[in-house]
């Protein structure tokens, strides 16, 4: 009679699919070529009646040696395999399963005929996995193929077997001792052959399919009479069987698709959506949408740099809300809000981080509430909010102790972040963060709104590697570089329409989006915050890198502009930066109390005088012309 064999079962740990999804997103992308993997069969402490089972986990994508190092010594056999992961479910369904199995089995036959299987007998257990990963729904369709090579052997005798099992799953027995199977070349095919096999099946009278492949290899080599010592962990079920080949084999029939638990041929489905923590699902989903950009459109996009960027949002209103949401969409994980206001009833419809409930009881603090609501959107974001007033140039000090604390806290926040967004209502509120950003070599992105216009710009940054006298060369200007007067109080004695941000609702969305996109583009440039203005589409992997973007809704036009820094700027000139570094709060306090101080420090006063003299000379020359 012929020996009986039992099919192998696959047990795939969820970590295998997590690793597969990572590889698909980051490495494989659209590549559908086969990738090597490894699995292992336990052969120790098998339960009675247990069928052979191959196990895979996240380490299955590493080398066989690394996988073996994670297992107890002498407890499992490592086998090599391959996984073919296709891009669509339709391809998974339409792929010819016969061709796939034949190709996988052909590799085993090739290893037999070129004698590679003698050097590495584990090739006889080579397996293949055909899969599709639905990364949006976290569903993984997969089907294992265990190529089984058929040959016809009949058992001529059978009996119990004693003694210890060899260390190797496949051995040649010579002089009663196991030796490497590679020595089979020295055994004539007409001689009786004695081999040993360590079985991974605990089913009585049914052996692992790998024994069938072993016997088929011997048949291909021309052996007709074989004695096999089949060792099992339960020594009482170990057997010695003598077999005789019934017909020669050259191109054996191949079978081996795994059956379902119902005994039917068909793939399995692993639904990890119900197993993974919802916060981790959200984290992976954000990364999924971003990493898909790298598959075809922007392969060299540096997402890790964007993700690691720490962003400080000064202003948590309309612009701050939209900037925060856009940063989340780009995968930024550290976002800090600063504001001194509370949520009012007019805010939620224009500021998407607030709800009606945030307006009750006098209104919740804007900064803290914005941070809390960001966490409701994405729990793993590191969002914080701080209520503080930014000291404003031209606004006299009213409470020095509190304002000094706000100054110190703002300085700490600027130092601890990479990008500073200026999103406040008033012009003078932006002065101190502009100075601090330059002092700390930070990327500063400024967004300002008009009724139907907007300005988005990145500030030029003083490069510490350049000498002071070289700082004027090619450095881009800041928000204040077009001013010939130092910032002063622009909020006092305003009517209601001047105090509120009166703008077409869509303007804020446009400006906020452009501000975040400008930041992302800057981060892709090798010079980052020191990058020059460029209108060339090849400047970064995302295209051009402008200095300023000015948009107008009345004619739906946007201009890309550039302006060098102003030598006498009240916010970014070398004299202001040096004075801030040397005097700190005392310098700021003097600027708050006396706007003329900044003009005197920077040389704007002299500019005014020269302008007046030029105007006077022009008037005199005109007057003299009247008497000619």
Swiss-Prot record:
Annotated compartments: Cytoplasm; Preautophagosomal structure
Source taxon at top rank: Eukaryota
Active-site residues from the entry: 500 (glycyl thioester intermediate)
Chief location of this protein within or outside the cell: cytoplasm
GO biological process, one term: cellular response to nitrogen starvation
Assigned keywords, A-Z: Autophagy, Cytoplasm, Protein transport, Transport, Ubl conjugation pathway
Residue window of motif GXGXXG motif: 315-320
SUPFAM superfamilies from the UniProt entry: Activating enzymes of the ubiquitin-like proteins
Molecular functions (GO terms): Atg12 activating enzyme activity; Atg8 activating enzyme activity
InterPro entries cross-referenced by the UniProt entry: Atg7 (IPR006285), Atg7_N (IPR032197), Atg7_N_1 (IPR042522), ThiF/MoeB/HesA (IPR045886), ThiF_NAD_FAD-bd (IPR000594), Ubiquitin-activating_enz (IPR035985)
Record-linked CDD domains: Apg7
Any single Gene Ontology cellular-component annotation: phagophore assembly site
Function: E1-like activating enzyme involved in the 2 ubiquitin-like systems required for cytoplasm to vacuole transport (Cvt) and autophagy. Activates ATG12 for its conjugation with ATG5 and ATG8 for its conjugation with phosphatidylethanolamine. Both systems are needed for the ATG8 association to Cvt vesicles and autophagosomes membranes. Autophagy is essential for maintenance of amino acid levels and protein synthesis under nitrogen starvation.
Description of how the protein assembles with itself and partners: Homodimer.
Protein family membership: Belongs to the ATG7 family.
Domain notes: The GxGxxG motif is important for the function, possibly through binding with ATP.
Protein name listed in UniProt: Ubiquitin-like modifier-activating enzyme ATG7
């Amino acid at each position: 009679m012929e020996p009986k064999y039992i099919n192998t079962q696959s047990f795939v740990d969820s970590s295998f699919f997590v690793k597969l999804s990572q590889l698909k997103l980051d490495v494989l992308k659209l590549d559908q070529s086969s990738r090597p993997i490894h699995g292992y069969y336990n052969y120790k402490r098998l339960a009675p009646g247990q069928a052979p089972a191959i196990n895979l986990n996240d380490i299955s994508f590493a080398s066989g040696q690394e996988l073996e190092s994670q297992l107890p010594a002498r407890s499992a056999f490592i086998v090599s395999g391959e996984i073919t992961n296709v891009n669509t479910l339709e391809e998974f369904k339409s792929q010819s399963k016969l061709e796939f199995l034949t190709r996988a089995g052909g590799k085993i036959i090739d290893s037999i005929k070129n004698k590679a299987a003698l050097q590495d007998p584990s090739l006889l257990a080579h397996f293949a996995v055909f899969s599709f990963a639905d990364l949006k729904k976290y569903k993984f369709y997969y089907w294992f193929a265990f190529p089984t090579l058929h040959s016809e052997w009949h058992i001529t005798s059978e009996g119990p077997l004693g003694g210890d099992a060899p260390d190797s799953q496949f051995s040649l027995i010579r002089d009663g001792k196991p030796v490497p199977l590679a020595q089979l070349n020295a055994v004539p095919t007409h001689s009786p052959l004695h081999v040993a096999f360590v079985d991974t099946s605990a089913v009585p009278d049914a052996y692992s399919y790998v024994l069938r492949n072993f016997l088929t290899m011997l048949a291909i080599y021309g052996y007709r009479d074989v004695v096999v010592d089949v060792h099992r962990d339960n020594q009482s079920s170990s057997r010695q069987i003598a077999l005789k080949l019934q017909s020669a084999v050259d191109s054996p029939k191949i079978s081996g698709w795994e059956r379902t638990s119902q005994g039917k041929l068909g793939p399995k489905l692993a639904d990890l959506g119900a197993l993974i923590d919802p916060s981790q699902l959200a984290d992976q989903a954000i990364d999924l949408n971003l990493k898909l950009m790298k598959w075809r459109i922007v392969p060299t996009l540096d997402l890790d740099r964007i993700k690691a960027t720490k962003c400080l949002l000064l202003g948590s209103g309309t612009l701050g809300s939209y900037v925060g949401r856009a940063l989340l969409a780009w995968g930024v994980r550290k976002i800090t809000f600063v504001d001194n206001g509370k949520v009012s009833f007019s805010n939620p419809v224009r500021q998407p981080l607030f709800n009606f409930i945030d307006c009750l009881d006098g209104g919740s603090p804007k900064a803290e509430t914005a941070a809390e609501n960001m966490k409701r959107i994405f729990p793993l974001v590191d969002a914080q909010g701080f209520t503080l007033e930014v000291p404003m140039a031209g606004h006299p000090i009213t409470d020095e102790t509190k304002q000094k604390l706000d100054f110190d806290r703002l300085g700490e926040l600027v130092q601890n972040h990479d990008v500073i967004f200026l999103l406040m209502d008033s012009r003078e509120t932006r002065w101190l963060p502009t100075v601090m950003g330059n002092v700390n070599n930070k990327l500063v992105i400024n967004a300002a709104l008009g009724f139907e216009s907007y300005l988005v710009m990145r500030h030029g940054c003083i490069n510490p590697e350049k000498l002071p006298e070289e700082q004027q060369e090619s450095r881009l200007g800041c928000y204040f570089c077009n001013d010939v007067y130092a910032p002063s109080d622009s909020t006092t004695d305003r009517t209601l329409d001047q105090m509120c941000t009166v703008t077409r609702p869509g303007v804020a969305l446009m400006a906020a989006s452009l501000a975040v996109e400008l930041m992302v583009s800057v981060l892709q440039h090798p010079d980052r915050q020191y990058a020059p203005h460029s209108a060339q589409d090849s400047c970064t992997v995302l295209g051009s890198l402008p200095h300023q973007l000015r948009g107008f809704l009345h004619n739906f036009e946007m201009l890309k502009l550039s302006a060098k820094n102003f030598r006498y700027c009240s916010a970014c000139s070398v004299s202001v930066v040096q004075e801030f570094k040397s005097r700190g709060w005392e310098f700021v306090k003097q600027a708050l109390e006396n706007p003329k101080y900044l003009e005197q420090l920077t040389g704007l006063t002299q500019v005014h005088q020269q302008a007046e003299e030029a105007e006077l000379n022009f008037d005199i020359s005109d007057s003299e012309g009247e008497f000619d």
